[in-house]
Amino acid sequence: MKLLLALLAASTSLIGLLSLTGCKDKNTLAPGESPSTVVFPDRNVSYGVHVQTLFNQACALPMCHDDGSHAGGLSLTSYYNTVFAVPGIVVIKDPQNSILVMKIEGRGPTGDRMPPGANALNQNQINGIRTWIAEGAQNN
């Protein structure tokens, strides 16, 4: 019984420690530096080439928006998860009212800007997500 209690206490401590190093506390980049190297074109944004690559580098990470963690109930690991799994995340052809855009711009009643801390997306990437949604949020 003592061993079981000790293991339970140790695992609880480990979980607490891991939660401190999770998505909300990633401040590894300098202010203004993007967590991704993806550069979006001004038009004809590709989900596969631009959007999902950006998400893989900046959002769909362990303890953030991957399939295992799905912080805030959102996984950004696939087109379906991004566009259809959570209503309102992407409002096709309406970036202004898409929760995804509100979150990356840090506006509206949606809570903190994402990615958190110093890991904000740069303006090109934010504009690229807006353009992708305005162009119909295609799976291309």
What does each model-found stretch correspond to?
Residues 18-22:
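C-terminal motif of bacterial Sec signal peptides marking the signal peptidase cleavage site
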Residues 27-130, 139-140:
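Solvent-exposed helix-loop boundary motif
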Residues 135:
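Extracytoplasmic/periplasmic copper-protein system
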